[in-house]
Amino acid sequence: MNPPPSAADSAHPKPKRSMWVFWMIVLVTAGPFVASTFFFYVVKPQGKPSYGQLIQPQRPVPALQLTTLSGKAVDLRKYNGYWLMIVAGPAACDKACQTLLFDIRQFFLAAGDDRYRVARVWLVTDSGPVNPGVFEPAEGTLILRAQPEQLKHWLPLAPGETLEGPIWLVDPLGNLMMRFPSNPDPLKALAVFKKLLYNTAGWKAKHLEPLP
């Protein structure tokens, strides 16, 4: 017969079990978004997506100096609640830049009924006139002028990489959490993005700032 637990044992439950109980309570009470994020980052083998790179630790959207093309100041943080797809590059926007804008537009369209949860952002890294040829592939995209030095401090780049190339994802909590490499494979990137939307389908923001 096993001896009854001592008073000391009762007063000090095993830490491992206590921590698991704590985290399960957090997952249940915090809602589907936190739970799905937990399983995407922690439970998935090796904690890696099938394509792209997780940004660890995540980087909250900082106070960037952003303006619309008409010069109105914009705080990107007010768009918390959306999945943000971000690309960057000079106003001249060459063929590769236009391809990126087209790709994120296709991602947006492929989101179907979840499109209202997605916002596309093009951060223009200079003060030059915007190439008029981009307005069609960038239709519906939030176009903002940005300070490239600020972006380099926030947006992670691979060795030898420039701002003009990757696609970055900001989650609805306002954290930069993933990047797709320069010249991304659009089909692979889309598959990962759709999985993120699916895994967070039950999470609804209390308020979504209307997009311009």
Where do the model's predicted regions map?
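N-terminal Sec-pathway targeting helices
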Residues: 15-29
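N-terminal "domain-start" segment that seeds a small globular fold
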Residues: 27, 31-34, 43-77, 99
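Short active-site neighborhood of thiol/selenol oxidoreductases, capturing the structured segment around
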Residues: 77-104
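Cysteine/selenocysteine-centered motifs that mediate thiol-based redox chemistry or coordinate metal-sulfur cofactors
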Residues: 4, 105-112, 203-212
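N-terminal Lys/Arg-rich, disordered targeting/topogenic segments
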Residues: 1-16
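Conserved helix-turn-beta segment immediately C-terminal to the redox Cys motif
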Residues: 41, 101-121
